[in-house]
Every structure is written in C-alpha cells, then in structure tokens.
C-alpha cells in the first residue's frame, strides 16, 4: 500500500508541475513595457486638456473619456 501512495504522490506532483502554465513573457507580467506601448488619453492628439475629455469623433480611435 505504501508503494501505491508513493506512486500516487509522485504522479500528483508531476501533474501539478505540468499543469501550471509558465507565462512569464505575458504583457501582464511586464507593466512597464505595456505602458510604453499604450497611448494614454492625455497624450492623445485629439485630447482636449481644457475640458479634460475627448471630442466625440476621437472616441472610436481610443481617446477616453469622451465629452458627451
């Protein structure tokens, strides 16, 4: 019975190690690089700094928040 327990423990450990995805290269793990690729609304060319929002024609192009 102890051999079966040892075998079961080894199998469970191996399965647990292979089931965990190693996704260290995903953008969520590298926020600094993700922020370099992202254009924030404040730097968007159509952002209205006085009203602190984007005109409606700019909203489909990723400028947020929209002046409604």
Swiss-Prot record:
Residues with the 4-hydroxyproline modification: 55, 65
Proregion residues excised on maturation: 20-51
Pfam families: Conotoxin (PF02950)
UniProt superkingdom: Eukaryota
Tissue: Expressed by the venom duct.
Keyword Secreted: yes
Family annotation (InterPro entries): Conotoxin
Entry-annotated residues carrying Cysteine amide: 67
GO molecular function list: ion channel inhibitor activity; toxin activity
Cysteine pairs bridged by disulfides in the record: 53-67, 54-63, 59-66
Extent of the signal sequence: 1-19
Keyword terms: Amidation, Disulfide bond, Hydroxylation, Neurotoxin, Secreted, Signal, Toxin
Compartment(s) of residence: Secreted
GO cellular component, one term: extracellular region
Domain notes for this protein: The cysteine framework is III (CC-C-C-CC).
Stated family: Belongs to the conotoxin M superfamily.
Function: Intracranially injection into mice does not elicit symptoms.
Name listed for the protein in its UniProt record: Conotoxin mr3g
Species name: Conus marmoreus
Taxonomic placement: Eukaryota, Metazoa, Spiralia, Lophotrochozoa, Mollusca
């Amino acid at each position: 019975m102890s051999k079966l327990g040892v075998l079961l423990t080894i199998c469970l450990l191996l399965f647990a190690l292979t089931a965990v995805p190693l996704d260290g290269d995903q953008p969520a793990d590298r926020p600094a690089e993700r922020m370099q690729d992202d254009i924030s609304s404040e730097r968007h060319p159509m952002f209205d700094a006085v009203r602190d929002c984007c005109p409606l024609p700019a909203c489909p192009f990723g400028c947020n928040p929209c002046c409604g």
